[in-house]
Amino acid sequence: MKLLAVRRLLRIQSVVVRYRLDDLLFDQPLLPWWLRALGYLLPWRWLPRRRSEQPRAVRLRLALQDLGPIFIKFGQILSTRRDLLPEDIADELTWLQDRVPPFNPQQSVALIEEQLGARVDEAFARFDSEPLASASVAQVHAAQLKTGEEVVVKVVRPGLKAVIRQDLAWLYLFARLAERASTEARRLHLVDVVSDYEKTIYDELDLLREAANASQLKRNFEGSPLLYVPQIYWDWCRPKVLVMERIYGVPVTDLAALVDQGTDLKLLAERGVEIFFTQVFRDSFFHADMHPGNIFVSTRQPWDPQYIAIDCGIVGSLTPQDQDYLARNLLAFFKRDYRKVAQLHIDSGWVPADTQVNEFEAAIRTVCEPIFEKPLKDISFGQLLLRLFQTARRFNMEVQPQLVLLQKTLLNIEGLGRQLYPELDLWTTAKPFLERWMRKRMSPKAMLDNLQGQLEQLPHLAQMTRTALEDISRPAWDTRKRERHDHHLLRLLGAALLAGGVLLALQTPPTSANAWPSWLMLASGLYLLVGRRRLSD
């Protein structure tokens, strides 16, 4: 084992002892009873405790901060997994600050010049060596292009990949050991949690990916009064350097400044909710890191306020099927139709097909009824989704990364909205949007567009069906995947019948006595594509 890795392990161990995290580690059901009992023999467990010792959640947060940027980022990711963590720990981890000392400006300049293949004074009319901000992954410098535009230059912290690889190796080791020793750890899929983190952190290291995300989000809201996204200057973007328009706005948490400029806080809060649902249901592409540090408010027209979003390193998206099931789930909640909520979870494949609907419905009712007894303005949309996911986990709900990101984003938007306007009624804002979206989705135009999309797949239908059948026949194919493929095969069959019916109808007059096969194929195809879904409602 390399000396640096050993030193890092000793460093982690010393932090665990200093912050008495043995309480958190050895008192949890993640470890078997014999290992928890062994933990009580550790010498420092018998040392007297200070009266002023802080709660376990605070100690964990301080320890993660002490261990450095990679563990800070991991803690931030963990804070979104409220289905895994006790509430006090999840709440405390949201306070983790991703602020670290800046690295040497000379290193920053050298990296920029290496990436751009040009000297800084050749690329920019002005470059401020003193950074505007510094975080665990990158730091930001102000600059001006030769053409006069004010920009910011984001630079990835040098040497970060080596640190990430080392810390990830230890995180994977700890997660695997816990899963081998404990059924509870296996249920929580700790290795998968680390794997999700690995993907997130490496995605954030690729600034071209972040630039592409920002460009997509800007295009989605081009000309919108709701949201402004700074322009990306692609000629100066590289994997480790991003150049974008410099924005000037009021931090969304600076309520005093927003009030001073006469901002309509109620409208601002409602627009935050509208932005969220527009991203999720209209665009199926949402900014998944909308914490207050990444959101500003334009100083123009405070009576008609506009958000400004930066840092698009983490984004999420939903498939059309996930969009549909999510919208119908939320509308069923509005009606307190818990049986429909339970059935939708089964139909979507989020929980196993053999789940007892009656038992699942009863569990959902037990969680939701106390919440719905509150006034609508006091109900937390994000907390409701969280409680639902926690309940579904008891019924072996498979972790859906896209839904975890969505729930985290919703909690951020909802919390932000109620800081701006405590009387915000998120339900009143959301329900009309969802109903409009569902009506539009079931409109003749939408069905025609869907038919066109299915017809475009017709030349590939035979190969797609063959591939699906080969996959489903594999011994390792699990039940959940089999259910999803069954659903996919039925849609393929529906598309084939619909396309065949259309082609047959073009050759046979619809009033002819020989037209019945085309009508039968059209009706069967429509049933498989649309009717089955509506019947499940």
UniProtKB/Swiss-Prot annotation:
The keyword Cell inner membrane applies. This is Probable protein kinase UbiB. GO terms for biological process: regulation of ubiquinone biosynthetic process; ubiquinone biosynthetic process. Is probably a protein kinase regulator of UbiI activity which is involved in aerobic coenzyme Q (ubiquinone) biosynthesis. Pathway: Cofactor biosynthesis; ubiquinone biosynthesis [regulation]. The chain crosses the membrane at residues 30-47, 489-507, 513-530. It is found in: Cell inner membrane. The active site is at 289 (proton acceptor). Belongs to the ABC1 family. UbiB subfamily. ATP binds at residues 132-140, 154. Pfam families: ABC1. It is a multi-pass membrane protein. InterPro entries: ABC1_dom (IPR004147), Kinase-like_dom_sf (IPR011009), UbiB (IPR010232), UbiB_bact (IPR045308), UbiB_kinase (IPR050154). The gene is ubiB. Its main location: membrane. The keyword Cell inner membrane applies. Residues 126-490 form the Protein kinase domain. One of its GO terms (molecular function) is protein kinase activity. One of its GO terms (cellular component) is plasma membrane. Its EC number is 2.7.-.-.
